[in-house]
């Protein structure tokens, strides 16, 4: 990977994709300096590595922000690289995965950077319902950058270092981080309902690989893999799953393959992906006899997510 071979951003890509499968796009792109004396600043790849590779043989497009380059901030060319990646992904019908570690807008580029945000938002909106969009927040994701995971289909957050916010917690009158950290993975998962999974970087990358293997590549594709499980096997422990339908669904699924969305939000309802005879199935189940508001919103949001897919429901 040009100019950033040893960066954490490139390491994350290498850990996510199948070995030696990554092909970089736009590795020689740097910032287009126009204002605020940026001419002498080094901006390798303009702070974001973009390209494509495979996960368990499936094509995916990936961008990974490099916090060592101006804090991973979004400038004009940084944004154009991400928007261009979306164009390639839509043409080939493959998912986009964003690995976010960004301090927000690059103030030195002013309105050029603001326009870049608009280009990314437009690309995401055009891809919505066409290809899966996945975002993992490993560091800071603040300001206008916070809209990007909100517009994607699946969001992951590093539980200790991930921070997701439009305004910092201290911007709320009478609040401070020690009182209520509204930027934390716990808050964004339990209260905002934005995060599907929170954990370590290794856990997140593993979960993304599992999720990609279950999802259709696009809205015209079917998610199907060869079933290696015994379709006639007995599920002896179903009686012990009465209190948690999530466990029940994982027992029913081929080889226990199971991915729960919005796991920390609206816990009275389970929304998940499982596999039955090799086919990916969307599942909605209740954990309690009465739905709360959050659980109902969660179920409706999940059905909207799958509205453009051809898969079955349970």
Which functions belong to the PLM regions below?
Residues 1-60, 64-66, 70-71, 185, ...:
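Intrinsically disordered, low-complexity segments enriched in small/flexible residues
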Residues 46, 72-84:
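Glycine-rich anion/phosphate-binding loops
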Residues 61-62, 95-99, 134-137, 156, ...:
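Structural motif
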Residues 65-70, 77, 99-119, 288, ...:
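Glycine- (often His-adjacent) and acidic-residue-rich active-site loop
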Residues 81, 85-89, 116-127, 306:
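Catalytic-core regions built around general acid/base machinery
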Residues 88-96:
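Structural alpha/beta core scaffold segments of enzyme domains
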Residues 100-220, 312:
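Conserved catalytic cores of soluble enzyme domains
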Residues 303-310:
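Conserved small/polar residues in nucleotide/adenosyl-binding loops
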């Amino acid at each position: 990977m040009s100019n950033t071979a040893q960066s954490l951003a490139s390491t994350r890509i290498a850990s996510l994709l199948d070995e030696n499968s990554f092909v970089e796009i736009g590795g020689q792109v740097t910032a287009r300096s126009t204002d605020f004396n940026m001419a002498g600043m080094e901006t390798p790849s303009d702070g974001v590595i973009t390209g494509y590779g495979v996960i368990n043989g499936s094509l995916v497009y990936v961008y990974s922000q490099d916090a060592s380059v101006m804090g991973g901030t979004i400038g004009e060319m940084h944004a154009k690289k991400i928007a261009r990646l979306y164009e390639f992904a839509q043409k080939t019908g493959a998912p986009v995965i964003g690995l976010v570690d960004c301090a927000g807008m690059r103030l030195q580029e002013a309105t050029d950077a603001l326009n870049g945000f608009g280009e990314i938002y437009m690309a995401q909106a055009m891809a919505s319902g066409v290809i899966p969009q996945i975002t993992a927040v490993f560091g800071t994701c603040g300001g206008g950058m916070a809209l990007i995971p909100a517009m994607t289909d699946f969001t992951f957050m590093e539980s200790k270092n991930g921070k997701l916010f439009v305004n910092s917690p201290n911007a709320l009158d009478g609040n401070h981080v020690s009182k209520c950290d509204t930027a934390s993975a716990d808050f964004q998962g339990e209260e905002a309902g934005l995060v599907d999974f929170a954990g370590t970087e290794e856990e997140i990358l593993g979960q993304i690989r599992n999720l990609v293997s279950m999802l259709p590549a696009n809205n015209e594709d079917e998610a199907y893999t060869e079933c290696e499980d015994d379709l006639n096997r007995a599920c002896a422990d179903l009686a012990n799953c009465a209190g948690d339908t999530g466990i029940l669904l994982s027992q029913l699924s081929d080889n226990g393959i199971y991915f729960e969305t919005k796991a920390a939000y609206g816990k009275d309802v389970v929304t998940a992906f499982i596999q039955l005879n090799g086919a990916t199935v969307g599942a909605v189940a209740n954990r309690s006899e009465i739905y709360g508001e959050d659980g109902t919103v969660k179920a409706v949001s999940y059905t909207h997510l799958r509205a453009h897919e051809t898969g079955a429901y349970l």
